[in-house]
């Protein structure tokens, strides 16, 4: 025998007597299709992993988890970077919250041309759009993980021939005041690495990238400083965090460095 909806208890809406607010509560790691416009004027259809949270006042026992999924499905396949702020607003309205947070992580593909042979191939990059809303005010940022090659200056200096090199991940999280293509952030990072990566290389290309890295050695410290200098000079970037992790080829650990800067509040990270 079915029970009328009006008679089903709403436990989440009941009062909580502990009087402790929750900063973030919601759903994590839910996949949903999205579309992303790329710089070549094409549309990439991909799958994003979403984390969606709201703040919960001290006097409420719980939030309504099903409503997060309803928000995703209400947009069907029309979720994009452009309507990301709309999703934030919809979420706090539907969840009756003052604050909200959404992370949208997805693979992004860029067509790259090999440096000598000219063969083309796709490279994938890990991208996350991050949005926060507090009392109607929205703040967004983009996080891009760029895989590159790094070659050790010390190894080159002390060795009679060769030098140890490895793949590195340079991660830029940027808060911008104007639109920036994902490709622009990727290119900025790749230009400051020992060498960029490619999906497909022929033998002449492999020779080129090997020698390019050897002629352009960089410590992990060099990498974050050089990328930070470029971001400092980029007027569209208000604040950033740049990280570099070198997956050391001669050690069983990584080398790591981080620089963060809020240009509007330079003393914040002094």
Swiss-Prot record:
GO terms for molecular function: GTP cyclohydrolase I activity. The record marks 152 as: May be catalytically important. Pfam families: GCHY-1. The keyword Hydrolase applies. InterPro entries: GTP_cyclohydrolase_FolE2, GTP_cyclohydrolase_FolE2/MptA. It catalyses: GTP + H2O = 7,8-dihydroneopterin 3'-triphosphate + formate + H(+). GO terms for biological process: tetrahydrofolate biosynthetic process. It comes from the Bacteria. Keywords: Hydrolase. Pathway: Cofactor biosynthesis; 7,8-dihydroneopterin triphosphate biosynthesis; 7,8-dihydroneopterin triphosphate from GTP: step 1/1. HAMAP family: GTP_cyclohydrol_B. Converts GTP to 7,8-dihydroneopterin triphosphate. Belongs to the GTP cyclohydrolase IV family. NCBIfam families: PRK13674.1-1. This is GTP cyclohydrolase FolE2 2.
């Amino acid at each position: 025998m079915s029970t009328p909806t009006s008679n089903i208890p709403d436990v989440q809406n009941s009062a909580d007597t502990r009087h402790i607010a929750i900063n973030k509560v919601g759903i994590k790691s839910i996949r949903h299709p999205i579309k992303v416009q790329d710089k070549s004027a094409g549309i990439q259809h991909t799958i994003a992993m979403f984390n969606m949270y709201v703040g919960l006042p001290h006097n409420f026992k719980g939030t309504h988890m099903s409503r997060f999924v309803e928000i995703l499905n209400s947009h069907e396949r029309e979720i994009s970077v452009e309507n990301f702020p709309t999703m934030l607003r919809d979420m706090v309205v539907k969840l009756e919250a003052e604050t909200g947070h959404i992370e949208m992580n997805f693979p992004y593909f860029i067509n790259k041309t090999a440096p000598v042979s000219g063969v083309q191939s796709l490279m994938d990059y890990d991208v996350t759009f991050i949005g926060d809303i507090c009392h109607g005010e929205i703040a967004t940022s983009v996080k891009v993980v760029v895989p590159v090659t790094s070659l050790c200056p010390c190894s080159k200096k002390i060795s009679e021939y060769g030098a140890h090199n490895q793949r590195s991940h340079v991660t830029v999280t940027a808060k911008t005041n104007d639109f920036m293509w994902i490709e622009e952030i990727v290119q900025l990072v790749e230009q400051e690495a020992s060498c960029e990566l490619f999906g497909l290389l022929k033998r002449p290309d492999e020779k080129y990238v090997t020698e390019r890295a050897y002629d352009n050695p960089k410590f992990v410290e060099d990498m974050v400083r050089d990328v930070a200098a470029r971001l400092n000079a980029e007027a569209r970037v208000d604040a950033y965090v740049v990280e570099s992790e070198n997956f050391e080829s001669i050690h069983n650990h990584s080398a790591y460095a981080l620089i963060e800067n809020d240009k509007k509040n330079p003393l914040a990270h002094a």
